Amino acid sequence: MPQLEPAPWFSMLTVSWLIILLLIMPTIMFYQTQNTVSAQQATKPKQPTWTWPWH
């Protein structure tokens, strides 16, 4: 079975993962979210939640 011979596909697998981890991942991690969440912005809802009657 050709899948069991790692020579043709294992090198492509490792090269593609190295490209993803070393080049693309730092670029993606560089972006920051525009909306920062802080505890001061969090407010409780003004109306209580409606409880469903379970019969």
From Swiss-Prot:
The chain crosses the membrane at residues 10-30. One of its GO terms (biological process) is proton motive force-driven ATP synthesis. Keywords: ATP synthesis, CF(0), Hydrogen ion transport, Ion transport, Membrane, Mitochondrion, Transmembrane, Transmembrane helix, Transport. It comes from the Eukaryota. One of its GO terms (molecular function) is proton transmembrane transporter activity. One of its GO terms (cellular component) is mitochondrial membrane. Pfam families: ATP-synt_8. It is found in: Mitochondrion membrane. It is a single-pass membrane protein. F-type ATPases have 2 components, CF(1) - the catalytic core - and CF(0) - the membrane proton channel. Belongs to the ATPase protein 8 family. Mitochondrial membrane ATP synthase (F(1)F(0) ATP synthase or Complex V) produces ATP from ADP in the presence of a proton gradient across the membrane which is generated by electron transport complexes of the respiratory chain. F-type ATPases consist of two structural domains, F(1) - containing the extramembraneous catalytic core and F(0) - containing the membrane proton channel, linked together by a central stalk and a peripheral stalk. During catalysis, ATP synthesis in the catalytic domain of F(1) is coupled via a rotary mechanism of the central stalk subunits to proton translocation. This is ATP synthase protein 8. It comes from Lampetra fluviatilis (European river lamprey).
